Amino acid sequence: MINPVTNTQGVSPINTKYAEHVVKNIYPEIKHDYFNESPNIYDKKYISGITRGVAELKQEEFVNEKARRFSYMKTMYSVCPEAFEPISRNEASTPEGSWLTVISGKRPMGQFSVDSLYNPDLHALCELPDICCKIFPKENNDFLYIVVVYRNDSPLGEQRANRFIELYNIKRDIMQELNYELPELKAVKSEMIIAREMGEIFSYMPGEIDSYMKYINNKLSKIE
């Protein structure tokens, strides 16, 4: 069962050169063992040191880049609208598109992945007003972390973020129950069960959700 950490009110920026401090600032309940490990190949883009616990932030790659990204995000930021309209799935098909549609007020919740907890976009996002993140490691992957970004100034924000995590866990449970099936068949069957509601909480257009469900159905019929 996934139990993500949440920064409920956003976080305040901290002035530090130490890599450990910035991660704990956005992910306070991360296991201590994480900092005893050597930086992975993706971490090394942003930090330098023998272990994450003694590593320092790289000035250009993390500090300056985070400042640039935060400045960009502030120009794109909008207060929460009274009502949200459906968006095209294509608008949120990239990590930037996913969080940009949230901070610009187009939808209350989105999801993307990062390959390092030192990703400057992640840290910049967490400092925006009324923008919150739930972070948890992707299962069976040594690098990826899933980030659920949502509007804290909309009741739909955390509600949909929590429902995403519930659906994510449902899909994982189904995959485990179907462990005797081929990997592709497990993936498609579990997707069939959660896909429509997942599309709805991501605010995708109803027609696009219908098209995706038809695609999944066709894919299932070809596999079975």
From Swiss-Prot:
Might you give the EC number(s) for this enzyme?
2.1.1.-
The cross-references to InterPro entries, in alphabetical order and at most eight, read: NleE/OspZ
Top-level taxonomic group: Bacteria
Q: Which reaction does it catalyse?
A: L-cysteinyl-[protein] + S-adenosyl-L-methionine = S-methyl-L-cysteinyl-[protein] + S-adenosyl-L-homocysteine + H(+)
Which residue ranges are recorded for the region named Interaction with host proteins TAB2, TAB3 and ZRANB3? 49-52
GO MF, one term, reads: methyltransferase activity
Which is one Gene Ontology cellular component term of this protein? host cell nucleus
Keywords, sorted A to Z: Host nucleus, Methyltransferase, S-adenosyl-L-methionine, Secreted, Toxin, Transferase, Virulence
Note one Pfam family from the annotation.
NleE
Main EC class the enzyme belongs to:
transferase
Q: Which family does it belong to?
A: Belongs to the NleE/OspZ family.
Assembly behavior = Monomer.
Any idea what this protein is called?
A: Cysteine S-methyltransferase NleE
- Say which species the protein is native to: Escherichia coli O157:H7
Lineage start: Bacteria, Pseudomonadati, Pseudomonadota, Gammaproteobacteria, Enterobacterales
